[in-house]
Swiss-Prot record:
The chain crosses the membrane at residues 8-28, 49-69, 77-97, 118-138, 152-172. Keywords: Cell membrane, Membrane, Transmembrane, Transmembrane helix. One of its GO terms (biological process) is methylamine metabolic process. It is found in: Cell membrane. May be specifically involved in the processing, transport, and/or maturation of the MADH beta-subunit. This is Methylamine utilization protein MauE. Pathway: One-carbon metabolism; methylamine degradation. The keyword Aminoacyl-tRNA synthetase does not apply. InterPro entries: Methylamine_util_MauE (IPR009908). Its main location: membrane. GO terms for cellular component: plasma membrane. Pfam families: MauE.
Length: 188
């Protein structure tokens, strides 16, 4: 197991994965700012005067973290900021799940339908992403030790993990049953 912890390719893969996840989350928020502001408001955690500034700032921080994760001198700080974001997301999700407000959109990535729901999966996913981010912050990467082949393999693996992540996110957002879909009842 120590080979995984100390393997620079694994750290690069984790860094790329978190960067892709953050960029994929940020870009739709820039493209649909009013919709994302509604998502932030729907969490009912912020005073109304903070909803708009947070909705504008959050995608910027996500995108800056995604870019900074690719820049070696900024990587550790960006990973710590990303971990902080994921912990805040986990808390916001957990509070709303605890309140029984599972019908709201998590705001992670934009969906083409309004059928998304939140649940403990989203909370645990955010905690797992925080853990991966902390791993990225903790493991030093000596890029001179990474071959071109290993780097390309890490990039391909990170892209595949990100696609699996987004696919799982979409599947979890589907209605619970065919009857829910037929009735249009997705907010149970």
């Amino acid at each position: 197991m120590s080979w995984l912890i100390n393997d620079p390719t694994a750290a690069v893969l984790a860094s790329l994965f978190i960067g892709i996840v953050l960029a994929a989350a940020a870009i739709p928020k820039f493209r649909h700012p009013d919709e994302f502001q509604g998502v932030v408001a729907n969490y009912k955690l912020l005073p109304s005067f903070l909803v708009a500034p947070v909705a504008k700032l959050l995608p910027l921080v996500e995108l800056l973290c995604a870019v900074a994760l690719m820049i070696p001198p900024a990587r550790e700080i960006a990973a710590c900021v990303a971990a902080g974001l994921f912990i805040v997301f986990a808390l916001a999700l957990a509070i709303n799940v605890g309140r029984g407000r599972t019908h709201i959109d998590c705001g992670c990535v934009r969906r083409p339908t309004s059928m998304s729901r939140i649940g403990m999966f989203h909370v645990m996913r955010a905690i797992a992403l925080a853990g991966v981010s902390l791993y990225v912050a903790a493991v030093p990467v000596e890029f001179s030790r990474i071959s071109i082949e290993s780097g390309l393999m890490g990039l391909a693996a990170a892209a595949m993990l990100a696609l699996l992540y987004m696919g799982a996110d979409m599947l979890v957002g589907f209605p619970n049953s065919k009857n829910d879909l037929l009735k249009g009842n997705t907010n149970d």
